[in-house]
UniProtKB/Swiss-Prot annotation:
GO CC term (a single one): cytoplasm
Self-association and partners: Homodimer.
HAMAP family documented for this protein: Aminopeptidase_S15
Catalyzed reactions: Hydrolyzes Xaa-Pro-|- bonds to release unblocked, N-terminal dipeptides from substrates including Ala-Pro-|-p-nitroanilide and (sequentially) Tyr-Pro-|-Phe-Pro-|-Gly-Pro-|-Ile
Encoding gene, per UniProt annotation: pepX
Protein name per the record: Xaa-Pro dipeptidyl-peptidase
Amino acid sequence: MKYNQYSYIGTSVSQAEKELKELGFQISSQKTNKANLATFVSQVYFHNPDKDDVFKSIIADSQTDLATFLHSDRELTEEIFYTIALQLLEFTPYIDFDEAKTFIKHSHFPIIFQPKHFLLNFYQLLGTRTKNGMTLIDKLVSQGFLPADNHYRYFNGKSLATFDTNALIREIVYVEAPLDTDKDGQLDLIKVNIIRPQTKAKLPVVMTASPYHQGTNDKGADKKLHQMEGELTVKKAATITVTDSHFQALQVPSSNLPISPAQESFSYIDSYTLNDYFLARGFANIYVSGVGTKDSDGFMTSGDYAQIESFKAVIDWLNGRTTAYTSHKRDKRVMADWTNGLVATTGKSYLGTMSTGLATTGIKELKVIIAESAISSWYDYYRENGLVCSPGGYPGEDIDVLTELTYSRNLAAGDYLRNNAQYQKMLAEQVKQIDRTSGDYNQFWQDRNYLPHAHKIKAHVVYTHGLQDWNVKPNQVYYIFNALPEEIQKHIFLHQGQHVYMHNWQSIDFRESMNALLSEELLGLQNHFQLPTIIWQDNSQVQTWKKLNNFGSHQTRQFSLGQEKKIIDNHYPSSDFKLYSDDYHAFKHDLFLKKANEIAIDLPIQEDMLVNGQIKLNLTLKSSSNKGLLSAQVLDYGQKKRFSDLPTILEHNSIDNGQNFSREALRELPFKKAPYRIITKGVLNLQNRTDLLTIEDIFPNKWMTITFNLQASLYQLQKGDSLRIVLYTTDFEQTVRDNSNYILVVDLAKSTIEIPIA
């Protein structure tokens, strides 16, 4: 294990002593270090009244247990302190470590022994993670060290799990949104699931905007998957024009209906464990699925500002600007008198996407977004550079398929009877607007692009994204992060996994960092927490995270791709075409081994380089036809240790998110030998070779010069590594599977790869 600690907030000795005493630790700067150590260890093991037994179970060094040491006149040394400290943090001598100081060095242990300020070491220990994924103070509180009395308690600038999760209020209200997306003449009502502790304190809110949470129509969506086999469309030369999107909300009339408590309750909802963590620390949880979902009104508009407005309306209700009702009858109002109105949003993928969209409305009470694997432009999710491009792992999906999946109103049979005909009519119109024929950008996609609205963001922004996420690709976060206003606070965690959460990883204290941030922004705690702008996981070594100031570099290194002209044949024999169409994994396997129709260039790396940003291909090429599709991937090629894409379980149920509440597994990305690693990739319609809004003719056998930006990356290359640049046409996982008979010729002597380096 290596420590990468970002959540700890440095403090003075006097403040540390004050906070320790407030927690009940009976230590004092007037006592000796050994006396304080005995007291501290006794209280850490508060469940066991036999302290002599506790002391005998811990060693001070390889020859002495703690009981013997405490009764001796030996001095408390650095080695003894570290040996004891590691045991308090759940590391086992002779199994996890032999010599404490060696382990401390290799694990980047964040505590320096300070015999003159020893109380500070106890304070730091409580704020440091154990081997099993919780800080020591969180572990103690989870075991009952502090009562769950529904009052806020803080340590090191973070809220502690002192809220009773065994007696939670679970209620449902229906918020009136300024929308009529199903065109039935009534404002849409939005179902809101609320989970909150029973307390007199005014609670902030952690909200997850999830179109999935009221259920999904998986069978219906599967039936709508598109066939990917077909011919690449030859488009007419043109310039595409779009207009700025300006969503216009409807008027919501004021109401003087009777006020009532919420009347509808629920017993269970599929919660997000990061939300559970905050729930136990005095943050109400809200789950809302928005328009077009089960028990709400409206049509599933899939990514536009009408959908976002349905989530914004919930924040408006929390702050008294719109009405919530007890039911669809709209006869009694419910007031959000239990909240301070301040909101943070959480969630991954579609959920994180809605966080970004919400932030671009500039709503002032949205103080923090924690957006993980989030989309910033829906065009770039379902299209790329003038091509229909399925999300990685989901061939044949498009936004109409997502609409069918998330329009969960049809899961309620009565709603289906009353509203399915109107839904089918509106879905058919959406299908026309998405334009699968050309793959071009249009007004539909402009209305689902949050980048032009990034300047309106006022919230404190936290993004996480996997650099191996080929579902929501890295450009999504690269573009939005670099479009954020200079004056706001922003951070990004870039990990080496794919489309995954990272709050329960061993190597980084993400969960605790978010606690410090939300305690400051939503609870008003003046903790002076500072988080680096960019925190990224170094791909070249295990459990190592580093800091950067920028995602993307203007400094580049350029390399020639060769000296000859090479051919990419688009056409495959029918047996190969069928094999690859039936199993895109077989295609990827052959592609990386130079067995597909491709040009593969191996480029030796002569010095260490940190790739930071978008690798660019400058190519001179021609097509034998009046069309052409170009795909590219850049690999770190050759057998060596690399991260796997998915985290694996290190310890089951070792993380307690409260006091015996919402336990989850500790995870980490495995680091093991592999033959290659994808650094970046991209696809391009050669008719869109200049830019997205310009469609140009391709003249057969006429040379073209193109610049092709691939997906953004942060990747450490080392001297002796080898880059493999793969150029090909059809990508059987993501693009149209066109088996027509044409070739691309690339003049490698006039082609280069341009690598941005930090």
